[in-house]
C-alpha cells in the first residue's frame, strides 16, 4: 500500500482521475486544513470550532475563496480548477449552481495538489485564503 500521508502522483495519474474524485479528496484536505488552522488560532470550545469550521467549508465561502485564488494560480492549477468547476454535479439547496461549481473547482484543485505531493503549494494557497478570511 502506498504511504497515504506522502503521496506524489504523476500529472498523468492525477489527470486520469475523475474530476469529482479529485474534488472528493480535496474536500477532505480543505476541511482538514480549516480545522487545523482553527485549532491552532481560534477559540478552542467545541461549539465555536464547529461553527467556525462550517463558516469556512460551505459552498458559498468556498466559492468566494475560489475567486480570490484564481489570479494566483498557474496554468496547471487553473486546469485542475476548471476540471472540477465544469464537472457535472447537483448543487444542494443551500448553494446556487454557480457557487457549487466554484466550490467544486476549489476542492478539485486542493485534491490534485495533495495527490501531487505539493503540500508547499497547498500551504501557500491556504495561507492566502486565511489572510483574507
Residue ranges and their predicted role:
Residues 1-133:
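Double-stranded RNA-binding/processing signature
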Amino acid at each position: 500500500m502506498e504511504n497515504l500521508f506522502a503521496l506524489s502522483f504523476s500529472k498523468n495519474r492525477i489527470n486520469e482521475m475523475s474530476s469529482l474524485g479529485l474534488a472528493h479528496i480535496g474536500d477532505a484536505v480543505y476541511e482538514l486544513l480549516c480545522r487545523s488552522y482553527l485549532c491552532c488560532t481560534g477559540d478552542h470550545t467545541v461549539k465555536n470550532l464547529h461553527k467556525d469550521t462550517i463558516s469556512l467549508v460551505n459552498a458559498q465561502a468556498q466559492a468566494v475563496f475560489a475567486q480570490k485564488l484564481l489570479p494566483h494560480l498557474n496554468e496547471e492549477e487553473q486546469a485542475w480548477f476548471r476540471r472540477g468547476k465544469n464537472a457535472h454535479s447537483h448543487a444542494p439547496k443551500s448553494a446556487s449552481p454557480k457557487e457549487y461549481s466554484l466550490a467544486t473547482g476549489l476542492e478539485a484543485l486542493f485534491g490534485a495538489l495533495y495527490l501531487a505531493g505539493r503540500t508547499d503549494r497547498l500551504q501557500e494557497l491556504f495561507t492566502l485564503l486565511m489572510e483574507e478570511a
